[in-house]
Amino acid sequence: MKLHIFNPENDMALASGSPGYTPPANIRAYRRRHWELPRQWAAPEDIVWDGESSLAHLFANDADALEICPWGWSPALVHELELAGVPRHRMPDREWLGKLRRLSGRGSTVAVQRVLGIDATCCESLDDVLSCLSQWGAIIMKSPWSSSGKGLMLTDNPNWQGWVRRILRQQGSVVVERLLRRRQDFAMEFWMKDGRAEYMGLNLFSTDAHGHFIENIKGSEQEKETMLLSQLDNPESLDGIRQWFVERLPLLAPWYSGPVGVDMLITPDGHLHPCVEINWRMTMGMVAVLGQ
């Protein structure tokens, strides 16, 4: 039996690192409205927490039989669950949470991108960013920490240099990647457990010109794969990168258990960009896959 928790503020809570982190009012309201979302993939016997009820009675007897499955882990969620009556030893310790925080930053994705031959780097000054712009011609800039789909900037925004200075001041660096035109956005969803990664399925979605999520594209796994293969100049690359992540994700984090979503895209000329983002938590893509 599992205890499911929908905490959509997880990215920023993890970035904060503070047990006392408080999400913005609109995010708190969103969580209250949608706390039942995990029912879409939960088993009938599972429990979905409303974010308010005491949980102490669930751990009074046979506590180890109940698996805690949040949208994502952070020190703030651990603190919240402690206040609700969950024993501290049933949750990740400080060392595990620290490793997850480092892994979840966009700087860790850059390390994977470089192995895959993708033009991406972490810049620690505006001059570094300008150098990337000169070298690559068109770039997308990302804050190392932000909520999902946020923290992105393009040079067509007249205030982009001020944005870079602010992110450098607040977070110490800015992630810069060569900007690619996109024909199709999609993600591969994986589940990690016991040092192994299992491929779960594909999620296709649409985005705006700045890469912000708009909506998922519905279809069976076979229909989605057929759609992608028809757009690729090298169809074999899809299976190749799927196997690459099955093998490499456990090497990146052998201690991690839970969902992993890898965002990818196909360019107008059919080239596969195999790693746009890596999300070490639940995603709406995984929700779509589990709901099939």
Positions of PLM-derived features:
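ATP-dependent carboxylate activation and anion-phosphoryl transfer catalytic cores
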Residues: 197, 235-292
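A conserved active-site cap/scaffold subdomain adjacent to cofactor or substrate pockets
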Residues: 203, 210-254
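Glycine-rich phosphate-binding loop of ATP-grasp-fold ATP-dependent ligases
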Residues: 120, 139-163, 184-187, 209-229
